Amino acid sequence: MAFLKDLYKNKVAKDLQKEFAYSSVMQIPKIEKVVINAGIGNAVADKKHLEAAISELTLITGQRPVETKAKKSIATFKLRAGQSIGAKVTLRGDRMWAFIETLFNIALPRVRDFKGISNNSFDNQGNYTLGIKEQIIFPQVVYDDVKSVRGFDVTFVTTAKTAQEAKALLVGLGAPFQKVRGDK
């Protein structure tokens, strides 16, 4: 079992219940899923870019992504409706916990001049979205095999009702947020 899953069950959940005074254990926020989305603009011109992105996401997540298709045709981008322009993966369960652990403990510290992840990327439903600029920060991706550096979005979907609850959950799991002035 993943270290973060044990940490959540044994420590973080109890700390959140005390901090927010939940009357039921079912009210304690948890991470439902992690969605990784990569939009590949170069895929319009050359399918090889999409195939490379799919293989890299498969290495990073341990799960094969599904291709995302364009909803509308846009002539200026030479894009037709139904054309594959990206890939996405939804992680749940043990793969989700393994990915979060890799992201927080290995990948993010490898980012150049890393000062922490943004505090402002929460939505009103308690979800958090993080942009990764380079896929090469993950240890599963071999630098020499990468043809072009591309980024992707990582969305943490939580059961938290507010951004404050979601941030407390992610901080408890070890998310490296930026220090706000006045914080220790």
Swiss-Prot record:
GO cellular component, one term: ribonucleoprotein complex
One BP annotation, GO: translation
Keywords attached to this entry: Ribonucleoprotein, Ribosomal protein, RNA-binding, rRNA-binding, tRNA-binding
Gene Ontology MF, one: structural constituent of ribosome
TM segment ranges: none
Family per similarity comment: Belongs to the universal ribosomal protein uL5 family.
Functional description taken from the UniProt entry: This is one of the proteins that bind and probably mediate the attachment of the 5S RNA into the large ribosomal subunit, where it forms part of the central protuberance. In the 70S ribosome it contacts protein S13 of the 30S subunit (bridge B1b), connecting the 2 subunits; this bridge is implicated in subunit movement. Contacts the P site tRNA; the 5S rRNA and some of its associated proteins might help stabilize positioning of ribosome-bound tRNAs.
NCBIfam families registered for this protein in UniProt: PRK00010.1
Subunit structure, as described in the record: Part of the 50S ribosomal subunit; part of the 5S rRNA/L5/L18/L25 subcomplex. Contacts the 5S rRNA and the P site tRNA. Forms a bridge to the 30S subunit in the 70S ribosome.
Listed name of the protein: Large ribosomal subunit protein uL5
